[in-house]
Amino acid sequence: MRLLEERILAEGTVLGETILKVDQFLTHQVDYRLMKEIGRVFADQYADLGITKVVTIEASGIAPAVYTAEALEVPMIFAKKHKNITMTEGILTAEVYSFTKQVTSTVSIAGGLLSKEDRVLIIDDFLANGQAAKGLIDIIQQAGAKAVGIGIVIEKSFQAGRQLLEDLGVEVTSLARIKHFDNGTVSFLEADA
């Protein structure tokens, strides 16, 4: 997605050899126009798969996920990183390691929000090692539902996440695919959409 790549080049900041900071439009401040376009592109990409729910993990995946759900006209669910007192029965959980935060979290979705009839599109802001999406696939399968696609806003293609998810049999669509970081600059591979 050329527009996204342009924003990364103009406003993204490379930190070290593996981190891209995109606080200006995705991970802290949200550019709703860009997110709306991202949602439209994901919806177009997966329009023929009978998606019934969009699922993400809080927090930075919520904006692109909600705009994707809007474009598909389906509900959006976000997995919570902290259990609250209203989540009492039938909670679906998975352990997820965050590459950026370097911490393992238990993420959860309340029972009853997913069913065996659901065809789920996973949306996330970044793909690095694939652990967040893998955890969501686990939760979706616990409900008897089917993960039919994974939409990634920014993929770090130099890390193993895509291969892990494709090995699980789920199609991955990334709107920006980073080949590598070199002296603070970003090099891209061809995006999927």
Swiss-Prot record:
A cellular component annotation (GO) from this entry: cytoplasm
Keyword tags: Cytoplasm, Glycosyltransferase, Purine salvage, Transferase
Alphabetical list of Gene3D superfamilies matching this protein: 3.40.50.2020
InterPro entries registered for this protein in UniProt: PRibTrfase_dom, PRTase-like, Pur/Pyrimidine_PRTase, Xanthine_PRibTrfase
E.C. code: 2.4.2.22
Record keyword Glycosyltransferase present: yes
A GO term for molecular function: xanthine phosphoribosyltransferase activity
GO BP terms, alphabetized: purine ribonucleoside salvage; xanthine metabolic process; XMP salvage
Superkingdom of origin: Bacteria
Binding locations of xanthine: L20, T27, K156
Major enzyme class: transferase
Reaction catalysis annotation: XMP + diphosphate = xanthine + 5-phospho-alpha-D-ribose 1-diphosphate
Pathway participation: Purine metabolism; XMP biosynthesis via salvage pathway; XMP from xanthine: step 1/1
Localisation: Cytoplasm
Primary localisation category: cytoplasm
Binding site for 5-phospho-alpha-D-ribose 1-diphosphate: A128, N129, G130, Q131, A132
Reported function: Converts the preformed base xanthine, a product of nucleic acid breakdown, to xanthosine 5'-monophosphate (XMP), so it can be reused for RNA or DNA synthesis.
Subunit text: Homodimer.
Family affiliation: Belongs to the purine/pyrimidine phosphoribosyltransferase family. Xpt subfamily.
Entries under HAMAP family matching the protein: XPRTase
Record protein name field: Xanthine phosphoribosyltransferase
Species, as recorded: Streptococcus equi subsp. zooepidemicus (strain H70)
The gene coding this protein: xpt
